[in-house]
């Protein structure tokens, strides 16, 4: 295995997923009225409802 592959393998195996997420609400995409999409599952369910 080459040095670059060894480095990648080590960094992959040593990665930590503990702690706070890096995503911040101030960077979230917002609609023109300032709201954000906080309940996407509800929206998707409503879009898939069959109208009779």
Curated annotation (Swiss-Prot):
Source taxon at top rank: Bacteria
GO cellular component, one term: endospore-forming forespore
Region (Disordered): 1-52
UniProt keywords, alphabetically: Sporulation
Broad class of where this protein is predominantly found: other
GO biological process: asexual sporulation; sporulation resulting in formation of a cellular spore
Induction record: Expressed only in the forespore compartment of sporulating cells.
Coiled-coil ranges per UniProt: none
Subcellular location: Spore core
Membership in a protein family: Belongs to the SspK family.
Full protein name: Small, acid-soluble spore protein K
Species of the source: Bacillus cereus (strain ATCC 14579 / DSM 31 / CCUG 7414 / JCM 2152 / NBRC 15305 / NCIMB 9373 / NCTC 2599 / NRRL B-3711)
């Amino acid at each position: 295995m080459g040095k670059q592959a060894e480095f990648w393998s080590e960094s992959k195996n040593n990665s930590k997923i503990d702690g706070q997420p890096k995503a911040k609400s101030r960077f979230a995409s917002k609609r023109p009225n300032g709201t954000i999409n906080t309940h996407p599952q509800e929206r998707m369910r409503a879009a898939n409802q069959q109208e009779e």
